[in-house]
Amino acid sequence: MLNLYLCQPNFRFGIAGKTGYWIPYSIGCLWSYASQFDDIKDNVELKDIIFRRENVDTLVDRLEDPDIIAFSCYMWNWEWSKEVAKRVKERYPKCKIVFGGPQVTDRPKEEEFFKHHPYVDTISLAEGELSFTDILRNLMNGKLIEKIYNYPRLTDLEIPSPYLTGVFEKIIADNPGVLWNGTLETNRGCPFACTFCDWGGLTYSKLKKFPEEKVLQELHWMAHNKMDYVTIADANFGVFTDRDMKFTEELVALQKEFGYPQVVDATWYKNSSEEIMEIVKNVISSGVNRGLTPSTHRQ
């Protein structure tokens, strides 16, 4: 059995004397996808999901014989992730270190990456579900892993949800006093190529939709689990007007029934229209209005 740790420390924030964290959505997606397969579920044990920027020494000391540690790297956790990875490799030289996420994807010359980060065993570019699953299988079977994984995009998005498959149940149960922020994807990709933006490496790419029923179920999960703040992570929310109106109507209904989410944030479709403005007005008039405002300017 391989011992797996997943790391995606995000911002900590405070509201009314309580501490809040973002649910580590990206890294959760990798595990919900990989663990749907029996061979991985039977041979890999998820030991912990690390969502806090813990003291490096304390974190390394509490690891239990790690075989694999995967990091979802962003600009706000980049330095921390590198230091943790370096220290883990010093303590556990056989442990495989996997880096992915936008901060890795943005590296201009991947071949040079390992010269500057020799403690990293492999990096995954762009979407990570397929490559992460392949990495786990190779390690399970005693095969060598590649230095760089850059797989094509998923052909469809009918994939397991980290919310609905229980990936986050343990960290929520173990941290009862924490306010959680959630991330929601209704689609992936972006047809534009704005000079200032790189939407996870998927700019100027075909839009692919998550199943509508899955999105609605995730919204219910977030309301029931009292996600105070929800970010809709689409590059162009509102591009599918009728579908996205249905999602906002569900958000309004859930907020009225359960009081959550209290804040919703979205990046809106470039080509604003009266229909999209109706979506905005629909939510603002409901009281879910502290974050759901149009951000439509693209260049």
Residue spans for each PLM region:
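Acidic, low-complexity intrinsically disordered segments
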Residues: 1-224
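Radical SAM [4Fe-4S] cluster-binding motif and immediate context
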Residues: 22, 163-299
